[in-house]
Design a protein with these regions (language model features):
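Solvent-exposed, low-complexity, repeat-rich "mucin-like" stalks and linkers
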Residues: 1-2, 61-100, 180-210
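Surface-exposed binding patches on compact interaction domains or structured appendages
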Residues: 1-23, 86-135, 201-218
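Tandem-repeat/low-complexity and Cys-motif detector
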Residues: 12-15, 29, 69-71, 122-128, ...
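A short beta-strand micro-motif common to beta-rich folds, especially ectodomain repeats
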Residues: 22-25, 33-45, 134-138, 146-160, ...
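Short beta-strands and strand-coil junctions in structured, solvent-facing domains, enriched
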Residues: 28-30, 88-89, 142-144, 203
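Solvent-exposed strand-loop boundary residues in beta-sheet-rich modules
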Residues: 45-47, 97, 160-162, 209
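Edge beta-strands of extracellular beta-sandwich domains
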Residues: 48-56, 163-171
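Extracellular interdomain linker/stem segments of modular secreted and single-pass surface proteins
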Residues: 56-63, 171-178
Length: 218
């Protein structure tokens, strides 16, 4: 006899003749609330019927998120995706102590296709009956003017305290060094003048030619 699927439950076989064991199995479930299906075993003809209730246990509350995300040296926007079955999600940031990436938590994120405030209750509680997708977008990230990767860690916390992290890394910028004067003319007394250096690297001054050129005045 062929199996039969009703709702989230599969019965194998879905029908029979006389005494027989029926295997009852269900789909994998990610909702936080136990679900129930009512079925009837009955004669193909006639009024003989027996009711059965199939309960499926709730899944544990959870939250998952992309473990890493990257931003180009030029800056811009990065989107981080995840899944959960929680009633609310709260986002926070921990910048790297040595080379921090400056980003701000947006006012809202997308949960099950709806704009949701950070830490706010998610509309219609989609996690009660299954997992849902969420995403958060960080925009207007400035260009990296340093020669180091910049890092910030995003933490998302579910209502039950479960957490997941994303390490956001911005690629190192290009090294540069500029000076505001290419020529300095000192007077005979050697009176000090200034060259201003604009750089994002460590630098030093070395002699560019093998010997000094002296002009002999006659």
């Amino acid at each position: 006899m062929a199996e039969m699927k009703i709702g989230f439950v599969t019965f194998n076989p879905g029908s029979g003749d006389g005494d027989q064991a029926v295997t009852v199995s269900g789909e994998k479930y990610k909702g936080r609330v136990r679900r129930t299906l009512q079925v009837e075993f009955g004669a193909e003809s006639g009024d003989v019927k027996k009711a059965a209730t199939i309960n499926q246990a709730a899944a544990a509350e959870f939250v998952k998120i992309d473990p890493t995300a990257s931003v180009g040296k030029e800056g811009g926007t990065v989107t981080i995706n995840g899944t959960s079955n929680s009633t609310k999600l709260t986002f926070s940031l921990t910048p790297d102590k040595t080379h921090p990436l400056t980003v701000e938590i947006p006012a809202s994120y997308q949960a099950a296709g709806k704009a949701t405030s950070n830490g706010g209750v998610i509309a219609d509680d989609p996690g009660a009956t299954g997992d849902f997708a969420f995403s958060i977008v960080f925009s207007d990230i400035a260009a990296n003017a340093t020669i180091n990767d910049l890092v910030n860690t995003l933490k998302v916390t579910a209502a039950g305290g479960q957490t997941a992290n994303t390490v956001i890394t911005q690629t190192a910028g290009d090294p540069f060094l500029e000076i505001d004067k290419a020529v300095i003319n000192l007077d005979a007394n050697g009176t000090p003048q200034t060259i201003n250096v604009n750089a994002n690297i460590r630098w030093t001054i070395t002699q560019a030619v093998s010997k000094l050129v002296r002009t002999i005045m006659k």
